[in-house]
Amino acid sequence: LITGGNSGIGFFAIINLLKTKNNLYVVIKSELRKNESLKTIEKYFDKNYLSKYLNIIENCDLSNLDNVKKIKDYFISKKIFLDVVVLNAGLQYTGSFYPKVSKQGIELTFAVNHLAHFYLVNILKDLVRDKEESRIIITSSDVHDPNSSGGNIGKKAGLNNLVNFRKKVSGQFLNFNADESYKNSKLCN
């Protein structure tokens, strides 16, 4: 299983995992993203090969925690157990002064980059085979480190002030900073 396979690390992970001739399950946010991904993946593999090994769990926007549960339901309904789970989905909207929120009222960067994966690991752990080779892999970033090239720009990461992860009763976030929110979401991983 892999999340966040549309581009970058996730996309190349999909290409390399498909070469192993194992069943690969890819979580895709929308029909549009599915079509874009397939068009690119088909440059590397023919459709017959993909029909054997590539399985897409579509319309699964990880910002909505209700969708995360649908992933578990998918595997249970098909009686599928997993050997490897790669949690790679990520979201960043640096520079914004206005937060975006999930269906559950959680700041979007934190909802996707941390909470969705945390929840997914916890609800899938019984479906990951108990073998020495089994893995749960979480990709992250070093921007939470103030000594890294990205971490020394803008506000520093720090979990001492978590008010911007969740909407206040008034519906407002306090002093929202998208860059700080991204760094904090990566620090949580």
Predicted features by range, described:
Residues L1-N189:
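Rossmann-fold NAD(P)H-dependent dehydrogenase/reductase core
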